[in-house]
Amino acid sequence: MTKRAFIFTLFFSLLSFQAGAAETNKDTKNPVVLIQTSMGDIEAELYPEKAPETVKNFLRYVHEGFYDGTIFHRVISNFMVQGGGFTPDMQKKPTHAPIQNEADNGLRNRIGTLAMARTNDPHSATSQFFINVAQNTFLDFREKTPRAYGYAVFGRVIKGMRVVNQIRQVQTGFKNGMGDVPLQTVEIIKVTQIQ
């Protein structure tokens, strides 16, 4: 085989390999979780390319069964529904260590997106998450300061937004010193990864 023929063969082999790799990347699908609640099912697609640490953290809790039997403990009808940290009797579940805030990933707090709940410390998110039921632009990343860091979006509802809207309409009140708690328990029966 001449040197020119060898280079020609090598060049087209590399092109074929790259085309195959690109085709494989198109077929790669994001993880999807099923959130079974006492009011119906919600499916959410997660974005590991945009929020790798957040998705890894969330799926760790999913695979451990952490969310099973927890509740949506904070519901504000024109804002969001929050869950993933309390039992039906309002006991806070022990969690893993907090994760780094990935709110600077370009994803926005829009209706139907999932984001991590946290304290005033930008890097304090553990297990609790919320589903936006409004265009919450004020929660988006602006700069790396405690007041402007934002809340990390890591997924979006792809099925069951009707259920989310039912949850947002439940009556709320005070329970165990906390406000905006549903008066009718909204249980997260089980969360499983289905893709």
Where are these regions (language model features)?
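N-terminal secretory signal peptides that target proteins for export/translocation
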Residues: 1-2
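Bacterial N-terminal signal peptides
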Residues: 5-16
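Cyclophilin-like peptidyl-prolyl cis-trans isomerases
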Residues: 17-195
